[in-house]
Amino acid sequence: MSIETFFQQLKHPNPNVRNQGMWGIADNYDAEVINRLMALLDEEDTTYRRAAVKTLGAIGHASVTPLVAALLNSDNMTVRSSAAKALAQVVICHPDEPLSEEGVQGLKAALQDPNPVVNIASVMAMGEIGAPVVHLLIEALQTTENPALAVSLVNAIASTGDSRGIDVLQAIINDEAADSYVRETATSAISRLEMVAGFKRN
């Protein structure tokens, strides 16, 4: 099948057909195909846009540089959040290949994005990376004054299963000056983290 047919499949209501198109593109991409997918990051058709995001993830590391550029430089909030989600998909689709330093630093910088849709998407992407970036998540949690971002960071730290997060979450729980919802989230997250970290040690 042609690339054009695969792109048409990305619009299909059936997720199995979309997946076929996604992997068809990922197996036959070039720079022009990546540019075409990048142009869909603000597509109004959410099914098509999400399929483009997943396809950029399926392509993998060849899409990281343009995704980071879009994440940090686009004026369009939808493009920035889609770029963060696509970087998460790179990690999900290629678990045996660490995200490049460029990708990690791009996500770290995007934690400071003023738009919550973008900074929370970046936190979620870093949560997918897990233990290799837990120190960056901890650093962001210790310095942010944004409660919504802090809640996302707490959950991402817990999801990594890295024991380094336990003391950080305990400090928030013990800090009576901290936002009450952030403390509440840390309380529920720490038990999850202790359980997962305990399994990893055994």
UniProtKB/Swiss-Prot annotation:
Pfam families: HEAT_2 (PF13646). Transmembrane segments: none annotated. Keywords: Antenna complex, Phycobilisome. One of its GO terms (molecular function) is oxidoreductase activity. GO terms for cellular component: phycobilisome. Induction: Present in both red- and green-light-grown cells. It comes from the Bacteria. The keyword Ubl conjugation does not apply. The keyword Cell membrane does not apply. Disulfide bonds: none annotated. InterPro entries: ARM-like (IPR011989), ARM-type_fold (IPR016024), PBS_lyase_HEAT (IPR004155). PANTHER family: DEOXYHYPUSINE HYDROXYLASE, PBS LYASE HEAT-LIKE PROTEIN. This is Uncharacterized phycocyanin operon protein Z. The lineage of its organism: Bacteria, Bacillati, Cyanobacteriota, Cyanophyceae, Pseudanabaenales.
